[in-house]
């Protein structure tokens, strides 16, 4: 066989061997798997010998994505110091106004009581607030109303409101007589009737004028229309249910005894004594019972009427005696207006100062950029290498 024939025969067998058969496909798969198994242990280098250079900064994409959110945050940070500074300035004006108002009310408390004008209307309450006035007339004890419960010295009780008929105008007004314990709410359970349930027709009562306030939206309203109990002093509702003028009068704190004086005795006393006062105070000797209507003379052992008692001193009770007897404890002549505007002023100005500092820090950080550029990174690396290498 010639050389040419041998080559052609080898080529033909090579072509025939390349034709895929069932056994050939299995062998090729096995060879490929074994070859991959051979190359798995080879570790290639991870060093990028030719790094990709670009002029694009990593900050570009992040700035585009977060530009809208940053604008909102910066807008709020700019607005916060301005708004808080304005509110602080507004509290300065409020502080001046409240200080003048409290000073004016304290000045009114120093004035002597005067008779309430006949033409007094609810619109005048603001100008007459904390002014002492004298009301002459009689109480309607069968129309008493209560606000509470309220605690006093750890004891449960209520504020007592009683309608009052004026002698000069016949007008029906509402007087807050004071605090009374829960056990003495019923009139039959009270003692010292000349103080707890005065029945005089021409009684004089010293009160403070207070402007009526409406019930707040978050305060409880009275659910039972037939009840005489309110949770809060809703003067308009109380006046409407009792037919009174919507004006709030608060009886003053008074622990002194005010015995009933007959009309002829009052006229005789006015002739013999040139000094006149709002109440006629009488002295009782130590043997005199407080609740009784008569006293016993130590010399004659005979009972004496109120008109025969000495009048040079005054009996004065304490609060505990009034609580046990069921006598309402009036309001002390003090100002209850709160003045917290100085605290609000410091709070708003402090918030303005702190928010300004945060804004300056945020602007400085935004100016430097959130991500380090390639040039800055290269400079930092060279600086580090010179220092430690």
UniProtKB/Swiss-Prot annotation:
Q: Does the keyword Lipid biosynthesis apply?
A: no
Q: Which UniProt keywords apply?
A: Membrane, Mitochondrion, Mitochondrion inner membrane, Transmembrane, Transmembrane helix
Taxonomically, the superkingdom here is: Eukaryota
Transmembrane intervals: 72-92, 342-362
Q: Which GO terms describe its cellular component?
A: membrane; mitochondrial inner membrane; mitochondrion; peroxisome
Q: How does it assemble?
A: Interacts with COA1, COX14 and MSS51.
Q: What is this protein called?
A: Cytochrome oxidase assembly protein SHY1
């Amino acid at each position: 066989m010639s050389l040419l024939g041998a080559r052609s025969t080898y080529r033909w067998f090579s072509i025939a061997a390349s034709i895929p058969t069932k056994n050939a496909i299995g062998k090729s798969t096995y060879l490929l798997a074994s070859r991959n198994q051979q190359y798995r242990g080879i570790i290639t280098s991870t060093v990028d010998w030719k790094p990709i250079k670009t002029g694009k900064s990593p900050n570009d994409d992040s700035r585009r994505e977060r530009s809208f959110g940053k604008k909102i945050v910066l807008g709020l940070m700019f607005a916060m110091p301005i708004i808080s500074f304005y509110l602080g300035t507004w509290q300065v004006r409020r502080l001046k106004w409240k200080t003048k108002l409290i000073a004016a009310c304290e000045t009114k408390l120093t004035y002597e009581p005067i008779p309430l004008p006949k033409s007094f209307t609810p619109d005048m309450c603001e100008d007459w607030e904390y002014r002492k006035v004298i009301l002459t007339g009689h109480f309607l004890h069968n129309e008493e109303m209560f606000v509470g419960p309220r605690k006093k010295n750890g004891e449960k009780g209520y504020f007592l409101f009683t309608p009052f008929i004026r002698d000069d105008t016949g007008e029906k007004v509402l007087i807050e007589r004071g605090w009374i314990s829960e056990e003495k709410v019923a009139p039959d359970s009270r003692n010292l009737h000349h103080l707890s349930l005065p029945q005089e027709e021409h009684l004089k009562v010293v009160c403070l004028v207070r402007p009526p306030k409406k019930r707040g939206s978050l305060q409880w309203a009275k659910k039972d229309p037939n009840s005489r109990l309110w949770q809060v002093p809703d003067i308009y509702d109380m006046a409407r249910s009792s037919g009174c003028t919507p004006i709030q009068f608060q009886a003053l704190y008074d622990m002194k005894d005010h015995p009933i004086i007959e009309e002829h005795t009052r006229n005789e006393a006015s002739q013999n004594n040139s000094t006149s006062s709002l109440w006629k105070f009488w002295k009782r000797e130590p043997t005199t019972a407080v609740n009784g209507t008569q006293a016993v003379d130590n010399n004659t052992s005979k009972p004496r009427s109120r008109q025969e008692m000495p009048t040079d001193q005054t009996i004065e009770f304490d609060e505990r005696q009034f609580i046990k007897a069921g006598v309402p404890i009036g309001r002390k002549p003090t100002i209850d207006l709160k003045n917290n505007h100085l605290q609000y002023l410091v709070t708003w100005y402090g918030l303005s100062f702190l928010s300004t500092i945060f804004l300056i820090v945020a602007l400085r950080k935004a100016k430097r950029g959130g991500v380090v550029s390639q040039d800055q990174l290269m400079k930092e690396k060279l600086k580090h290498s010179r220092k430690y290498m």
